[in-house]
Amino acid sequence: MTIVGLARNLVGDGRLHAARWVLRLRIRLRHPTLFSDPTAIWDYGYSDIDAISLGERVWVGAFAEVIVQRHARYSRVEGRLRLEDGVVISTGVNLRAAGGAIQVGAGSVISQHCVVVAANHKLEPGIARIHTPWDETRCGVEIGANVWIGAGSVVLPGARIGDNAVIAAGSVVRGEVPAGELWGGVPARYIKTIE
């Protein structure tokens, strides 16, 4: 039996903790990555592990929550997560790659308690928000190489952050941040060019 098959059986038997342990083991065997304990690697299902691509020397801090759902209920866009070499996901970070892809370039740091969301629900009157389809016109997040996202920041669906950019702590990023610039605030705005 494969590791994914074993995880599915454990989930079916209600042994969720054991299934998470098996998935964590599979990720560690396939990728030289350091996960601090406790880290929630999965939340929606145990068949989407191939939607995660990890480079070498990726570090995921304690209490991080990494959610990848390839086929989300209210979206036709695939959820995927790609963390390139040397990426640091700090303590308490929440990555939600469902209904869109999240890509983080080599050497980037997502500081403590940041939230990165690949998709969000549409605003449609008269429908419970949780049941509205996801906005497929603005989804996915691209974070370039050597980017530093300050603690407590939120990166919204559709955001594109260029290489060597810095996001000040507590910012809300939407839209495009050019390479080599410092942005901050709610919503994040240009502060200066990094020289």
What are the roles of these predicted feature ranges?
Residues 1-118, 141-145, 153, 163, ...:
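Domain-scale signature associated with acetyltransferase and cell-envelope carbohydrate enzymes
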Residues 55, 84, 122-131:
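Short, flexible, mixed-charge acidic loops at enzyme active sites
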Residues 97, 157, 175:
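Conserved coupling/switch loop of ABC ATPases
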Residues 113, 119-121, 134, 169, ...:
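Alpha-helix boundary/capping detector
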Residues 120-122, 127-128, 159, 193-194:
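Conserved catalytic-core motifs of eukaryotic protein kinase domains, centered on the activation segment
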Residues 130-141:
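A short acidic, glycine-rich active-site loop
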